[in-house]
Amino acid sequence: MKILFLAFLICSSFLFPSSSFASHVELKPCVEIAHCVREEWEVNNIEKPFEEIKTFIENTPRTKIVEIDGDYLHAETTSKWMKYVDDLEVSFLPESNIISIRSESRVGESDLGVNQKRVDLLKSKMF
């Protein structure tokens, strides 16, 4: 019985990556500042911003939400001309009324400011 349970645990770790159980995820820091932006915003009511950000991302051209799990959202944005994919992550920390945003290019040394513009646009829609 113990072996069967252990086999189940091992198999389930491959089927369900740890990010699929995300709740109150601490977003990783930006390693390459030239193509990554990470910010934290304090808000009064965490529920309203979550829905606003989700709706904004759903309506953004060439952007698709690939994961929503609890207080974590991951979207992919594809550039219009070169078809580069950037990752946009949002984590909500309800106990502290903090929203963490992280936008990073997957390739290249510089994003020519695209990620900062994306985060600034999101922020302008929020506040």
What are these regions (language model features)?
Residues 4-12:
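Sec-dependent N-terminal signal peptides
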Residues 16-127:
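Ser/Thr-rich, low-complexity intrinsically disordered terminal regions
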